[in-house]
Amino acid sequence: VIKRLLFALCFSSNCLWAQPPAQNPDAQKRALLKISAAEKAYKKDLWPNINPAYFFANLRKNVEHPLYIHQGKPTYFCGYAALTHLLALVDPEEYVKLVVDVLQSGHTLTKDHKKLTATKEIREAAGTLYNKGEMDINHADQVWFMVLADSYKGYLNWKNPTYKPGGENGFWAASNYKKFNRMLRSLTGLEVHARGADLIGPIMGSYYDFIEEKNEENTVILYLNNKVLYPNKFFKFILRTPTHFVVLYDLKREGKYNVLDYWDYGLRTQMKLRKNKFRKLVYGITYIENQ
């Protein structure tokens, strides 16, 4: 206004940049009250494998500490985690409303009136994902990410439209760039601008200068080629398209390098890249005017 999650937020070395808006404390309090009310009213009818203690602890943590939101390893939930990071920051009440609706009734409506539905396969699988790091006990994330993956489809999902065990690690869960921006508009109700594509980066001069300009009054989300960002990562990439979405906190120049300070995998991370490598890294630049 987020296979190591999410978005990255940018600043320049000589100009103050806009970060994602700080979470409104009153909105956070109202969101936490909604969580407490939902916890008291919870019935385990729809979700046989959800542990309510894990679920509500996870939901509270996401509202209180959006930076900690994590996609799990080695899933393709990166885009959903990035979206959730942003939504929990800018509209924690809407985020809680959507997740609690899905928990209580198995469906919810987004701001653009899209119906998100938890299918029988999703309801039975949520709570059973394991060997995913901290996601093993993040049951709210399991519910929410799986519902998003099942409700929004792009061309990467055509051959795997229905969840099957292990689908979180492959094409069923993948997000291409156009799908990600569509989800972002749907969930936030905000005007979303995007430059770039899955197979080629934005056609323009300096990426750095463009991001610097847009980040003065916008939150900037980058679509990155993870094979360039993390060439030695332990898991195997199976997609030929970029796979990583990050929300940038700072971008500055240090001699021959661009230094990125960004959020992904539940942390803020800093990385120094040569300028030519930075251009190879970026495939999409999404920006949203800060409210």
List where the protein language model places each region:
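Bacterial Sec-dependent N-terminal signal peptides
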Residues: 1-20
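Active-site nucleophile-adjacent alpha helix/oxyanion-hole segment immediately C-terminal to the catalytic cysteine
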Residues: 25-160, 211-221
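Short, flexible loop/turn elements at secondary-structure junctions
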Residues: 74, 82, 87, 224-228, ...
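Cys-His-centered catalytic/binding microenvironment captured across papain-like cysteine peptidases
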Residues: 236-243, 252-291
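Short, flexible beta-strand-to-coil junctions
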Residues: 149-164, 223-230, 252, 265-267
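Extracellular-facing segments of soluble proteins and assemblies that are Gly/Ser/Thr-biased and enriched
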Residues: 128-200
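Active-site-adjacent substructure of cysteine-protease-like catalytic cores
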Residues: 195-260
